[in-house]
Amino acid sequence: MTELVFILDSSGSMSGLEKDTIGGFNSMLEKQRKEPGDAVVSTVLFDNEIEVIHDRVAIADVPNLTDEEYYVRGCTALLDAVGGAIHHIGNVHKYARREDVPEKTLFIITTDGLENASRRYTYDKVRHMIERQKERYGWEFIFLGANIDAAAEARRFGIDETMAANYHCDEAGTALNYQVISEAITSVRASSAPLSADWKKKIDADYKKRGGKR
């Protein structure tokens, strides 16, 4: 079984990309429902507040995202979203029977801006949590950032820069994001090996082609 945790930015700066985000996410879900193997999905939306809309739902049963759930407002409480999700999933695994703990856990973090609104978690706290889960349990984290230096921000979270990508926060960039995310998830679900560093090459190529600067 694979544990999939999506941390999605729904802050006000995502305005205008709601339909693209919803469509990309649902297309990715549709592809993953057809893949072999069991998976459970958690989806966390963040702005000023944190909202969990899927809590470890079997991939076949995850409902599509709608505009009633995904709408933009507020600031960017990214640390609280990531820290809260790690704490919750970690506790579930801690108290589960060994045979019920997923073999693989993958967090997919997407943001179009820097942290500016968290109240419960700090960079140091979240970095410690991420490093602990990676080292002890082999959890994997990918970080997709727009309008920021994604590699530098990922490092502050304890995520290796090979697992971070800058993307263009527009219709084409968002669609490509979810295509690549789906491919990365397929790779993780199909193999016991860690995700290869070339998971993001299509996003990197698009970012460079369209004038992105690191």
Predicted regions and their residues:
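Acidic, low-complexity intrinsically disordered regions
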Residues: 1-214
